[in-house]
A protein has these predicted regions:
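Edge/loop elements at the starts and ends of beta-strands within beta-rich repeat scaffolds
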Residues: 1, 23-28, 47, 135-140
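A short, polar/proline- and glycine-enriched secondary-structure boundary/capping micro-motif
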Residues: 41-46, 64-68, 128-132, 153-156
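Conserved interaction-surface patches within small, structured recognition/assembly domains
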Residues: 15-23
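A short, Trp-centered hydrophobic/proline-enriched beta-strand micro-motif
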Residues: 1-12
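General beta-strand recognition
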Residues: 31-33, 53, 117-118, 143
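Acidic/charged, solvent-exposed loop-and-adjacent secondary-structure segments enriched in E/D, K/R, S/T
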Residues: 52-84
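Membrane-embedded segments
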Residues: 33-42, 52
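Gly/Pro-enriched, hydrophobic low-complexity segments
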Residues: 94-165
């Protein structure tokens, strides 16, 4: 299935907008493409749990810190399953803890509708990334916001359609 979103990216006060496309290539790999609204490709990645390949990227975005940050973001966003270590409850959500490498992921499932509404990626001491989801069903989110706390980066994705031909 292809996921197509209108994307707005704010990085250090600079704004980019365009189209974000994520396509599942096989069971483990996704291809992620970000283009301008006119169709010019800004970045093109292939990403899986263990592999990452940059197919193309424009010179202005070709920075190691940005590429590694986007790799982390897209892995969190496109991950199919998590190994849960602990479960917590708060007033609004069931919270599931997963531990990966040097960070923890907290998955917040709404008690009201039983949908994923937030993923928090954190070190032992502080939050690094929050992913917020607004969805109408359990297949895809109509809005996704990726907010960083260690760098000035915010990505907002608004759903356009489910398939492109």
């Amino acid at each position: 299935m292809d996921y197509v979103y209108k994307a707005n990216i704010t990085i250090y006060g600079n704004e980019l907008s365009g189209i974000f496309i994520a396509k599942r290539i096989n069971d483990t790999t996704h291809r992620v493409v970000f283009t301008t609204e006119f169709g010019n490709k800004l970045l093109d990645f292939e990403i899986s749990e263990n592999d990452f390949k940059v197919n193309s990227i424009v010179d202005e975005l070709d920075r190691k810190i940005l590429i590694n940050t986007l790799k982390t973001d897209f892995r969190l966003l496109l991950k199919n399953s998590y190994v849960i270590q602990q479960q917590y409850d708060n007033s609004a959500s069931k919270v599931y803890l997963t531990e990966e490498d040097s960070s923890n992921n907290y998955l917040f499932i709404s008690k009201a509708d039983n949908k994923l509404n937030k993923i928090v990626n954190a070190t032992k001491r502080k939050e690094r990334i929050n992913l917020f989801f607004t969805s109408e069903n359990n297949i895809f989110a109509i809005k996704i916001v990726i907010q960083h706390y260690n760098i000035k980066l915010r990505i907002e994705l608004n759903y356009l359609q489910t398939q492109i031909n």
